[in-house]
Amino acid sequence: MSNVVVCALYKFVSLPHFESLREPLLSMMEQAEIKGTLLLASEGINGTVAGTQAAIDALLAWLNNQNGLENIVYKLSFDDEMPFYRTKVKLKKEIVTMGVEGIDPLKVVGTYVKPQDWNALISDPEVILVDTRNDYEVQIGTFKNAINPVTETFREFPDYVKQNLDPAKHKKVAMFCTGGIRCEKSTAYLKEQGFEEVYHLEGGILKYLEEIKQEESLWEGECFVFDNRVAVDHDLKKGQYDQCNACRMPITEAEKLSLAYVQGVSCPHCIDKISEEQRKRFVERERQVNLAKSRNEAHIGSDVNQVIEARRQKKEALRQQSVEKNKAKQANV
């Protein structure tokens, strides 16, 4: 049975003093041995973390006791292994970066559509269905008949809208993303641009996969996630994709057979994009990873500090032994 609980959460809320939350939140996560990253900004909180069920329950309870963070939106999935290496709480300008000033989902946002009602909506021929995620995410899975804006980052989405969507022509627009947060901003942006009927999938793809049976589903493929699982299938279990440690792109087993694929160094997606300096750096990093594995040690993450401390203590013990031996020799002279 999977014993690691993965929790994706977010909430748009005015947090004028969000900086003061960082240290107590980080301390709470470290004490509970929760790993992953949470983002704090004046507009709210966002992130994905993982830990035991008790630890995640404690985190959600802690957040619920903070002014403004009550009833936070979250989705749970499960894994056999910890999908994160480190524990981080970062301070940001935005909890999801669109880069457009004045977009506030707290003031205006699209109409939420529950997973149970989503199929009927997107089956309407008058509805334009747009995937708000990045191209590499769309490539491994999306909803049937969804439009791929072919963006590399969410910052490019406003330009896609300006060039391809027209409020006078596209009367009904439905959008979706992984957990719902990008759609909060994308629907708010469309409403600001004059689109009247704008809908988005409440809880995102992950909530849809959780609540809709596969035989009734209009989802095709797997869903990319921003952790070491890379992607999840319809049962929210780790999917078939791996990840290139050089460019972080999802890769298939077939792509790993390519001559362009070198573990930790390159893949078909990045072989022509990385410089010789980067390649050398990636080769050295992979060498260090393999060396750590041979010693059964962590290469990155919070466990590295334990490894370093253990080595320091071992060296100190050897130094003390050497000092004692020298003292013994001098005493016998």
Swiss-Prot record:
CDD domains: RHOD_YceA. The keyword Glycoprotein does not apply. Residues 123-217 form the Rhodanese domain. It holds the Pfam family UPF0176_N. Keywords: Oxidoreductase, tRNA processing. The keyword Flavoprotein does not apply. The active site is at C177 (cysteine persulfide intermediate). SMART domains: RHOD (SM00450). Its EC number is 1.14.-.-. GO terms for molecular function: oxidoreductase activity, acting on paired donors, with incorporation or reduction of molecular oxygen. GO terms for biological process: tRNA modification. It catalyses: uridine(34) in tRNA + AH2 + O2 = 5-hydroxyuridine(34) in tRNA + A + H2O. PANTHER family: RHODANESE-LIKE DOMAIN-CONTAINING PROTEIN 7-RELATED, THIOSULFATE SULFURTRANSFERASE/RHODANESE-LIKE DOMAIN-CONTAINING PROTEIN 2. Belongs to the TrhO family. Catalyzes oxygen-dependent 5-hydroxyuridine (ho5U) modification at position 34 in tRNAs. This is tRNA uridine(34) hydroxylase. It comes from Shewanella sp. (strain MR-7). The gene is trhO.
